[in-house]
């Protein structure tokens, strides 16, 4: 991260016109692939849109963060569970890329019930000169065939195709909240409210249940699983977080069913801060391993915390994301905003973390310098290549010209989903139905 963390540069933004934006257009997940060349977004309408980095822009410092639409496809359709009389939304909950092994790209996408493996490939040639079919693909009358032709490949305009290669269904009773690809690249896991399943990419009709916290009597249920992720380097290790603010690290070598954790991370509650909302705001909405695998980052309603895998009793770092909302918890409870699930991400070197807030604000915290900055993703101040100015929220007292009052924050505008390029300071921020791409300020 450059020294001036308090200034970022917007390089491009993909905007949909508010006049025709619908609920289906709201972006529900954002994810860079392992090289950062592709950026995938999923929305509430079940669509996946993939953006590709402009090749010419890589060598031009001012344009190195420009992405264009590469492929768009319908990943999930709305369904109906007739046994339970429940509608299954088409909304894309999570997208996860697999490392590229050949010319094609592979990604996982999931809604509440079904995970799909997609292959995204390019085609710039088409076969011609079939003997038994005409150019439109219709069968020819064998009696009209007088010569034997050798089919040839002809150049054509580049076409990007997305095809479903695997469908992993019928394994989750509750809503899927997480998917995570294992470092062995042969397996992945999917987590719902009460269970975590382990899948092999080649087997769609069977999965192994590795965590099950469902009590025999559902009235005894005290917590649910909120997020889960595999360790980036050790294929036997994974973590999952709960609505009680705890994190469990499990080792699949110890037991096939990982109901008994290897490590248990929990911060003791400060009795002086105890309130009616304590349990709600302590629920963890996201958990992420650092790229090094040494740390875990968690996000609850008001804070982002960094945990060392070797210290279970408290986090090594705690960052206040929007502590000024502590006095507003009652109204946030009434309008259901207190249940919003904010995600968090690391930069490529694990030195900076990023997470979202309200009013289309998002926050960055430099772990080394302990400096932080609040930035805004909005149409009004986001012209291409404009410098983003830090924003400040004023709590009571006199408000400066460049500050915004906590009472005037728009809670309908929220940054829940963000992504960071794996090796460069390029970030993607989803603000409702708009996607913004930001890059480092270039002097």
UniProtKB/Swiss-Prot annotation:
Tissue: Expressed in the brain. Isoform 1 and isoform 2 are expressed in the forbrain. Isoform 1 is more strongly expressed than isoform 2 in the olfactory bulb. Isoform 1 and isoform 2 are weakly expressed in the cerebellum. Isoform 1 is expressed in the testis. Isoform 2 expression is undetectable at birth rising to adult level at day 14.
Molecular-function GO term, any one: protein phosphatase regulator activity
Transmembrane domains' residue ranges: none
Domain of life: Eukaryota
WD repeat segments: 22-61, 87-128, 171-209, 220-260, 279-317, 334-375, 410-442
Hydrolase in keyword set: no
Family annotation (InterPro entries): PP2A_PR55, PP2A_PR55_CS, WD40/YVTN_repeat-like_dom_sf, WD40_repeat_dom_sf, WD40_rpt
Modified residues (Phosphoserine): 275
Entry similarity comment: Belongs to the phosphatase 2A regulatory subunit B family.
Subunit structure as annotated in this protein's UniProt entry: PP2A consists of a common heterodimeric core enzyme, composed of a 36 kDa catalytic subunit (subunit C) and a 65 kDa constant regulatory subunit (PR65 or subunit A), that associates with a variety of regulatory subunits. Proteins that associate with the core dimer include three families of regulatory subunits B (the R2/B/PR55/B55, R3/B''/PR72/PR130/PR59 and R5/B'/B56 families), the 48 kDa variable regulatory subunit, viral proteins, and cell signaling molecules. Interacts with IER5 (via N- and C-terminal regions). Interacts with TOMM22.
Protein name, per record: Serine/threonine-protein phosphatase 2A 55 kDa regulatory subunit B beta isoform
